């Protein structure tokens, strides 16, 4: 998982180059699970024998936008890993057989409007995620 990897790298490496030219939205698995439960609860309440009216494709991710660089900086900041010099770099500096889009932010309008979801920002969910990870260590 990216958070665990960056926690380790920012705690052990003096410098770290991280891609800044690809934007997306980190998604906390717990937030996704809560959204899935809300959809399933809605489905169960609507008596599916009569046909479920809210079909289609729904996108979900946390709110906000960041680059991998921004994400890593925030992880290091929250962890107090201030010794690592995190530097932005271009994605072409990390050759990959997989082509990734420069902008991969999902439109969540449909899922928010259909199910009345209040989706947390990635920065807030990252704090919760890291607190939960820390609690599991104890």
Where are the model-predicted features located?
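NAD(P)-dependent short-chain dehydrogenase/reductase
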Residues: 1-24, 30-38
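Tryptophan-centric aromatic hotspots in well-structured domains and transmembrane helices
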Residues: 2, 68, 121-122
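Residues that recognize and position ribonucleotide moieties
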Residues: 16, 25, 64, 87, ...
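Residue-level signal for the nucleotide or nucleotide-sugar donor/cofactor binding architecture
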Residues: 24-27, 66, 106, 117-120
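Mid/C-terminal beta-alpha module of Rossmann-like enzyme folds, strongest
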Residues: 35, 42-97, 137-138
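A hydrophobic C-terminal alpha-helical subdomain
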Residues: 93-114
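Amphipathic terminal alpha-helices
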Residues: 122-138
């Amino acid at each position: 998982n990216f958070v665990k990897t960056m926690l380790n790298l920012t705690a052990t490496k003096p410098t770290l180059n991280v891609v800044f030219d690809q934007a997306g939205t980190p998604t906390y698995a717990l937030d996704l699970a809560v959204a899935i439960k809300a959809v399933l609860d809605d489905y169960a309440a609507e008596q599916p024998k009569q046909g479920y009216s809210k079909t289609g494709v729904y996108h979900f991710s946390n709110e906000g936008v960041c680059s991998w660089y921004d994400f890593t900086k925030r992880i290091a900041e929250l962890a107090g890993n201030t010794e690592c010099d995190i530097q932005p770099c271009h994605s072409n500096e990390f050759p990959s057989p997989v082509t990734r889009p420069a902008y991969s932010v999902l439109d969540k309008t449909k899922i928010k409007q259909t199910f009345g979801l209040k989706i947390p920002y990635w920065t807030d969910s990252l704090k919760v995620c890291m607190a939960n990870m820390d609690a599991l260590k104890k």
